[in-house]
Amino acid sequence: MLGALQLGVLAACVVVLVPMGMAGWHLSRNKMLFFSGALFITLAVGVHLTPYFPSVTDFVSTVSSVVVIDNRRTCISLLHDVVWDVTKSPGFSTLNNNSVNYDKSWGWTSSSRVSACEFQKLSRSDASDLLNGSWVVVAGDSQARFIALSLLSLLLDSKDMESIRGDLFKRHSDYQIVVDEIGMRLDFIWAPYTSNLTDLTMGFKRNRNYPDVLVMGSGLWHMLHFTNASDYGVSLQLLRDSVVSLLPISPERGTDGPVAGSVPVRSPHVFWIGMPTLINSMLNTEAKRERMTDAMRGAYDRQLQKSKILRQSGGPLLMLDIESLSWNCGVRCTVDGMHYDVPVYEAAVQIMLNALLIESHQKL
């Protein structure tokens, strides 16, 4: 028995070819009339065959979805394409030639691909709208603390930040604040080792209470106190497994549902704070200069890539590439070769906020 599609094609042949063949001879003297009749019959057959084929609307919708996902991926990959302008400040002094003598500004490159993404430096109002009602957790070492400081500096005025800065930078301590105007809660968790971050994520899962945005990073303390790249790599893999268990895997990463053991809750946006460029000659202790070498830094970077914790290698965390930002800002953007001036972390925060806009399909 012929299927519906085959019957439709057979009917089309009969309806189109027979009348056109019969009419061809009689209308050959009037080609305009002949082709008008042929067009009319073809359109009529098209209308009758349409139900037997996939909806054109569905096809266009599918293609559009693929294009949107591809555009999002492209723009995410271009977020760190920034340029720096480092110039002598008006009060420049040759007697005190350090980073405070230089003004730093940055912006995204003007290439056509970057311009098409329409990245923007969010204002206080824009950032407040984006993070309204959110719970943000920033966890890690001193690099994470600078990220938390830069985010709060964007959301609050300088008067409020005076007291916050002192509390936030209390040595090796946690910090929590609620920005009442927008109902945003920020927790900074002192977690210098990757194992601390694993414990933190397991706590979220155990309590079934998850932040909207989770920003974390580690490596500097491990490099200084353990100086063992392979051990660092093992701890990263354990952290990756813990984070993956929290998140439903998106179709963009190749699967349609949650992984085994994941929980059916709103998944947080998760970021990884990369380690900065280390300028060995500027490090302020002998132990740091001896252990935190370029070779050791390279070994730690390779373990980070090998762990597949980052989105770019198939993992769940989107990288905030402090190494790239600090390298491009340069030696005039740091006093101690490890901690960089505020603009570097401000750039990282703006990159993070633009990633949130892209991933949540929002525009301001």
PLM regions with names:
Residues 1-364:
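A compositional signature for long Ser/Thr(±Pro)-rich, low-complexity
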